[in-house]
Amino acid sequence: MIPNDDDDANSMKNYPLNDDDANSMKNYPLNDDDANSMENYPLRSIPTELSHTCSLIPPSLPNPSEAAADMSFNSELNQIMARPCDMLPANGGAVGHNPFLEPGFNCPETTDWIPSPLPHIYFPSGSPNLIMEDGVIDEIHKQSDLPLWYDDLITTDEDPLMSSILGDLLLDTNFNSASKVQQPSMQSQIQQPQAVLQQPSSCVELRPLDRTVSSNSNNNSNSNNAAAAAKGRMRWTPELHEVFVDAVNQLGGSNEATPKGVLKHMKVEGLTIFHVKSHLQKYRTAKYIPVPSEGSPEARLTPLEQITSDDTKRGIDITETLRIQMEHQKKLHEQLESLRTMQLRIEEQGKALLMMIEKQNMGFGGPEQGEKTSAKTPENGSEESESPRPKRPRNEE
């Protein structure tokens, strides 16, 4: 049975090499199919676990034929390991299978590290990537190998997503495996394509930046000049104000006129839009009603005069209202006085009526009392008559 299948590789993980396995491997040398399959699935580099597996190989073989077969196997294995690493096979198939790097691989670790070189693994002197120094294997990549391998990886891969993922994995593995001395060179090599790609964009972006900077400087200078011009005060003469009023009237009044349109209609040198804007604002706040053009210009008033006239008119209106209010108050007082006099007259008339009524009552009550008294007097007389008079003695003389 030829050990070129994945099942055999998995079985080799659980069963380390011994004398019988070495003899069996001696009787089954590698053929062309196995060599092609191993070329398609080469190892990336010698892992650290491989150094521990080397202790499993017996230090000596009983027969010279077995030693020669073992040396040939080791030489082929070293040639395969010395080749550059490809993450994908040449036919664009699946990723190569490495049984030594799987998580289920149990490798016995030796407690003591022997600095002496390994006796039965031959490392050729012409290997570009492996150097034996004090029993420690350091992986050193030449600067010329990385760009070629990186270009081959990009050209052979068809999927852009896969290429980006493999590129990230490549950067991580190279960063962890390389020494501190080679880190700057590797980073410069990796960043070299990016710098080449970024050069055209930077050249293209220089002109818009320059234009924007120049436009910003022009805008700043224009704004400074406009601010300086706006800060400069201007005296509005009556003639200039007349031109301003004519322009406003032509544009349809102060509510519809704009500073830009007024400036175009006025056509006065040295006059800026800021002056027109401020004057138009004052003109609107003053609520100036322009006199028709038929009137003489002498009858027209300035905004300040119009404001004073408006104030006087408002004062006159206020005084007029106060005067009217005082008149109403006077009328009210007069009405109140008339009401009081009427009340007094009514009271007097009432008293007079009462007096008259009493007099009438007194007039009607006098004859009745006389009758009563007369009635009383005859009764007294009758009584007196009825009463016996004392008899006087008669004189017989």
UniProtKB/Swiss-Prot annotation:
Gene Ontology molecular function: DNA binding; DNA-binding transcription factor activity
DNA-binding region per UniProt: 259-284
Gene3D superfamilies given in the database record: Homeodomain-like
Locations listed in the record: Nucleus
Start and end residues of each stretch annotated as Disordered: 1-27, 359-397
Residue ranges with Basic and acidic residues bias: 386-397
Keyword Phosphoprotein included in the entry's annotation: yes
Source domain of life: Eukaryota
Major localization class: nucleus
Keyword field: Coiled coil, DNA-binding, Nucleus, Phosphoprotein, Transcription, Transcription regulation
HTH myb-type domain ranges (all copies): 228-288
Name of the protein this chain belongs to: Myb family transcription factor PHL4
Keyword Zinc-finger in annotation: no
Cellular component annotations (GO), alphabetically ordered: nucleus
Gene inactivation effect: Separated male germ unit (MGU) with all nuclei separated from each other making a wide triangular figure.
Gene giving rise to this polypeptide: PHL4
Motif (LHEQLE): 332-337
Function: Transcription factor involved in male gametophyte development.
Modified residues annotated as Phosphoserine in this record: 387
Region annotation (Coiled coil) ranges: 319-339
Similarity annotation: Belongs to the MYB-CC family.
Xref: SUPFAM superfamilies: Homeodomain-like
A GO biological-process term: regulation of DNA-templated transcription
